Regions:
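Short, basic alpha-helical nucleic acid-contact segments in DNA-binding proteins
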Residues: 43-49
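Recognition helix of helix-turn-helix/homeodomain-like DNA-binding domains
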Residues: 23
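Short amphipathic alpha-helical segments
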Residues: 30-40
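Charged, low-complexity intrinsically disordered terminal regions and linker tails
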Residues: 1-11, 15-19, 37, 49-137
Length: 137
C-alpha cells in the first residue's frame, strides 16, 4: 500500500476552505484538516464519483503529518481499495494524496447540503450518526 508522505501538503480549493472555516467557526471540528479528512472518508464510504473533480486551483492547508496516524492510515487504505476497485494505480505519495483530495472535494458539497441550516451541535450529532451507521457496515 502506498503511503502519503508526512511532509506532503493537503491542498483544498478556496471554496472547500471556506466551508472548512465555517465548520471550525461553528465548533464542529477543532482543526480544518480533520473536517477535510472526514469529508474524504464520508465520500469514500458513500462511493461518490470523483471522475469530474479537478485538482487545479488548490491552496496549501497543512502537511499530511498533522493528521492523526490512524486517520492517515484509514484514508490511505480507503484510497488503495477504491483505486483498485476503479482500475486505478497508486504509484506514489502524490497519487494517494490526489485521490484522497478528490474524495474530500466530492464529500464537502454533499455534507454542506446535508448540514444546511443546522447548528454546530446538530452537525456533531449527525456526525455521530454517520459514524455509527458506518460502523455497522
Amino acid at each position: 500500500m502506498k503511503r502519503m508522505e508526512k511532509d506532503a501538503m493537503i491542498r483544498p480549493t478556496s471554496e472547500a476552505k471556506g466551508y472548512l472555516d465555517h465548520l471550525k467557526k461553528q465548533s464542529v471540528f477543532r482543526r480544518l484538516v480533520d473536517a477535510y479528512a472526514f469529508a474524504a472518508a464520508f465520500a469514500m464510504n458513500q462511493g461518490m464519483d470523483i471522475s469530474t473533480v479537478s485538482l487545479k486551483g488548490r491552496y496549501d492547508l497543512t502537511d499530511v503529518g498533522t493528521l492523526d496516524e490512524e486517520v492517515r492510515l484509514a484514508l490511505e487504505a480507503g484510497a488503495a481499495v477504491l483505486a483498485k476497485r476503479n482500475g486505478l494505480e497508486l504509484t506514489d505519495s502524490s497519487s494517494v494524496i490526489d485521490i484522497v483530495t478528490k474524495y474530500a472535494e466530492a464529500g464537502l458539497p454533499a455534507l454542506k447540503e446535508r448540514w444546511s441550516g443546522k447548528s454546530g451541535l446538530q452537525i456533531q450529532n449527525d456526525i455521530q450518526k454517520i459514524l455509527s451507521d458506518s460502523a455497522q457496515l
